[in-house]
């Protein structure tokens, strides 16, 4: 299903003229042009690099150009057509292996003769003349190359260009005759390949032995990684080798890898969260869909010129099945939409999840998730929404050396949000451990507790307790959390400037085993009340009386279950935020 969807996306892009036909890579980083004259002599070395923005500054980067399809190299010699590095196009490099450089140059010359012999094009004849006359030993000291030799050998890719006698010049990759010759060679390249029925197209065709590399996944090898590969006998079916184990035609392998590489290269279609790289696309290939989805999911709307209010309005409308205008395009909630999560695994890619639904259904799942997360927040917290990464960070000790959340947790959380499924238990466990260790219920942790119990255990009691702000629920654990917050406030008012409160010593025991902590805390509060002014004493005594009256006559519970501890923590958070809100109003 993944490969079929990516192939269909490629074909949609091809119809729209946004990608090259099979046999060509749409975007390849090229740094220099080797401009040739009619006799094949090197006339100039042109720098094709350009300034591109990177963060708050600009950097010099290679230009992305369409080039003939690249071969996937391992350790052997394999030349590319028209565009390659100095080892292949010039026969020299700084790797200290002159014999191998000579072999690379000879292989490249043979490839160009095979494709271009007999082609009636001045540019083609110039390229062949270059290979026939070029002396690789002279490359490092050539007057046109010596000044840039270090840069040429710094992972730079070169492409042939041509200048006619009248001064007109163009890249060889744009020459019609050369393009036609390459297309013919590429189309017949699989003539000797093993044929079988392609699993993607359903047609009999030459099978790709090795699939093109996928590049752009953070953490994967720089040379690229494989989504489909077989590199050991244990993975192979009897009598089959490499790609024959899962027959995919050369065309389909090119199509799906081209589509995925384009998505990974477009920051509006791709987002990294933890070790998972997420790519998303609409069936009609309209970029506004993936752009909007990543804003909904990961934030960053204002950086892309969209206000938070407009984004929220668009999400709400789509979740209700209504089309909206967004980024100069119309978003249809019925449009088929895909989300793929992949992670690096040495030279391969692991699929974390692959989801397919209507765009409106994804929007509804995200809206439901946002509604469950909504909770009163401190005045200093200006964030409208909590991203997936922010939620996962709430499970991590920020003082530890490794501040990254579990990759498994991040992947499970992503899937739960996008599918509308139950949140992973590891999310609740991680948050509970951090609350116990730090004795701190942050907005993020309170939001997670609320969302977890409302989605995973949507009982009437949980709907009553886990609300956006303070409520008058008489659920005992919730009341105990409120009571603990009031007791902490009484101590702070009675002892201004105190360094540590009862929260530092008693929070965990009060949350898990109330009967062991609260009797002591209530007695301590009576002493604190005696230190206060009469108005404060009356105010807090009234609060204590009202909350104590909601507790059972049998006294404080001996212990609280994990869900009851969640209610305690929410009660504590609600009451504490109510106190801070009142204080801010008075100021």
Whereabouts are the PLM-identified features?
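Conserved phosphate-interacting/catalytic interface
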Residues: 1-190, 235-587
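Short metal-coordination and nucleic-acid-contact micro-motifs, chiefly zinc-binding Cys/His arrays
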Residues: 190-196
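Short Cys/His-rich metal-coordination motifs, predominantly Zn2+-binding knuckles/fingers
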Residues: 201-204
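Short, solvent-exposed secondary-structure capping/transition elements
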Residues: 207-211, 268-269
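Short microdomains enriched in Cys/His and/or Lys/Arg
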Residues: 209-245
């Amino acid at each position: 299903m993944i490969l079929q969807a990516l192939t269909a996306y490629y074909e949609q892009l091809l119809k729209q003229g946004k990608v090259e036909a099979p046999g060509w890579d749409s975007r390849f980083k090229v740094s220099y042009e080797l401009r040739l004259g009619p006799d094949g002599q090197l006339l100039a070395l042109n720098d094709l690099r350009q300034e591109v923005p990177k963060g708050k500054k600009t950097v010099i980067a290679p230009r992305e150009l369409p080039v003939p399809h690249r071969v996937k190299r391992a350790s052997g010699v394999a030349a590319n057509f028209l565009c390659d590095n100095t080892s292949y196009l010039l026969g020299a490099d700084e790797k200290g292996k002159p014999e191998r450089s000579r072999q690379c140059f000879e292989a490249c010359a043979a490839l160009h003769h095979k494709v271009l012999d007999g082609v009636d094009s001045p540019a083609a004849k110039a390229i062949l003349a270059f290979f026939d006359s070029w002396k690789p030993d002279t490359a490092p000291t050539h007057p046109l190359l010596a000044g840039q030799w270090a840069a040429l050998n710094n992972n730079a890719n070169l492409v042939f260009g041509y200048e006619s006698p009248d001064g007109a010049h163009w890249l060889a990759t744009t020459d019609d005759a050369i393009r036609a010759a390459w297309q013919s060679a590429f189309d017949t390249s699989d003539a000797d390949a093993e044929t079988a029925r392609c699993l993607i197209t359903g047609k009999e065709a030459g099978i790709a032995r090795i699939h093109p590399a996928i590049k752009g996944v953070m953490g994967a090898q720089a040379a690229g990684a494989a989504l489909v590969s077989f590199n050991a006998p244990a993975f192979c079916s009897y009598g089959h080798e490499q790609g024959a184990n899962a027959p995919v035609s050369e065309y389909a392998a090119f199509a799906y890898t081209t589509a995925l590489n384009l998505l990974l290269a477009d920051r509006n279609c791709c987002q990294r969260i933890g070790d998972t790289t997420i790519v998303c696309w609409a069936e009609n290939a309209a970029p506004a869909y993936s752009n909007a989805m990543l804003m909904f999911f990961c934030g960053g709307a204002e950086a892309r010129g969209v206000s938070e209010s407009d984004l929220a309005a668009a999400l709400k409308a789509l979740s209700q099945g209504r089309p909206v205008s967004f980024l100069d395009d119309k978003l249809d909630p019925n449009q088929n939409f895909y989300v793929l999560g992949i992670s690096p695994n040495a030279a391969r890619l692991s699929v974390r999840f692959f989801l397919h639904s209507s765009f409106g259904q994804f929007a509804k799942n995200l809206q439901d998730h946002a509604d469950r997360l909504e909770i009163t927040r401190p005045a200093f917290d200006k964030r409208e929404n909590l991203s997936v990464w922010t939620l996962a960070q709430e499970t991590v000790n920020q003082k530890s050396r490794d501040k990254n959340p579990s990759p498994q947790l991040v992947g499970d959380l992503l899937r739960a949000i996008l599918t509308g499924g139950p949140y992973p238990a590891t999310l609740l466990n991680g948050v509970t451990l951090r609350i116990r260790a730090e004795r701190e219920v942050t907005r993020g942790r309170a939001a997670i507790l609320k969302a977890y119990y409302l989605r995973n255990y949507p009982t009437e009691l949980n709907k009553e307790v886990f609300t956006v702000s303070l409520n008058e629920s008489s659920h005992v654990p919730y009341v105990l959390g409120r009571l603990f917050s009031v007791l902490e406030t009484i101590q702070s008012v009675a002892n201004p400037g105190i360094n540590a409160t009862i929260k530092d010593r008693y929070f965990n025991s009060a949350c898990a085993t109330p009967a062991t902590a609260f009797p002591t805390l209530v007695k301590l509060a009576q002493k604190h009340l005696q230190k206060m002014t009469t108005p404060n004493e009356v105010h807090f005594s009234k609060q204590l009386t009202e909350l104590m009256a909601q507790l059972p006559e049998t006294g404080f519970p001996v212990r609280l279950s994990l869900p009851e501890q969640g209610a305690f923590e929410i009660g504590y958070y609600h009451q504490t935020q109510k106190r801070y809100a009142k204080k801010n109003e008075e100021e």
